[in-house]
Regions:
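Residue-level recognition of single "structural anchor" positions
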Residues: 1-273
Length: 273
């Protein structure tokens, strides 16, 4: 007979991954072998990606904020060899769109921080919406062209750029960001009346706290890009459909009228069967 892990233990392992634990720490706490946990996370993560792709459609969002957060695969970009680029090693950015009202993440994409990935991300976002939106982003140079290509003139889009002070050479900041001296808001398309990325920047913090592969100074980073994408998909499925948000007092999927009740971790596992 095949040695199949009971659904309760699978749910425990997946929940631990979704709450910021590394694979090896889950192994120590549950006694499940790390290779089994890895395969489970990939399988459930891929199923979650397919589920969200089909479920998050015709969304009635009003204010969307987009941003990208940095991570890396196997090694940081400065350590990469020319041949590493084709295999997906080095820096990876996760582009995230957040509905400022419901806190739903309707679209996300992991890849290089370049024009191609930005275009794919905005195209995907546009295809999930049913109405005109207010869209805000930072000043990343590829956003303006990507928004124009995806939305045309059917969007109210603005950029917010934060200007930072030059750090004093004697200042011991360690990992703290430099001081913000000015914030510039610029309308790009249409008539955006509220340009802000505050909520999506807070969402970046949530991702780093709940997805161990993206934690600051982590030693639990991904070794393969495909595994990283599966972990990110698992996180956002848990965030959108399972975890209660304290501000809105329900899951983001419920707030956006995508679901009428929260899902359980066991439901995510069932999708992968």
């Amino acid at each position: 007979m095949p040695n199949i892990l009971p659904i309760e233990k699978q749910a425990t392992a997946v929940l631990m991954l979704c709450e910021g634990n590394s694979i090896r720490s889950v192994e120590r706490m549950t006694g499940i072998h790390r290779d089994t946990i890895m395969r489970l996370g990939i399988r459930v993560g891929n199923a979650c990606a397919d589920f969200m792709d089909s479920r998050l459609r015709e969304l009635n969002c009003r204010r969307i904020e987009v941003d990208e957060l940095w991570g890396f695969i196997a090694k940081k970009q400065a350590q990469c060899l020319p041949e590493d680029y084709a295999t997906g090693l080095g820096d990876v950015y996760t582009f995230v769109a957040l509905d400022a009202d419901t806190k739903l993440v309707p679209s996300f994409l992991a890849g290089r921080r370049d024009e191609v990935t930005t275009n794919l991300f905005l195209d995907d976002l546009q295809g999930r919406l049913s109405n005109r939106i207010q869209l805000s982003s930072d000043g990343w140079r590829s956003y303006a062209n990507a928004v124009h290509a995806a939305f045309g003139s059917e969007v109210d889009y603005g950029q917010i750029v934060k200007v930072y002070a030059s750090p004093d050479k004697t200042e011991e900041r360690k990992y703290s960001p430099p001081r913000i001296t000015k914030i510039e808001r610029s309308p790009i398309v249409g008539e955006p009346d509220h340009i802000s990325t505050s909520y999506v920047e807070k969402q970046n913090h949530t991702v780093r706290m709940h997805c161990r592969r993206l934690s600051r100074l982590t030693n639990a980073f991904s070794k393969k890009l495909d595994n990283f994408k599966s972990a990110v998909a698992l996180h956002f499925a848990y965030y959108n459909f399972v975890r209660f948000h304290k501000t809105i007092r329900c899951t983001p999927a419920m707030a956006a009228s995508v679901e009428s009740s929260p899902l359980e971790v066991a439901d995510l596992i069932e999708m992968a069967r």
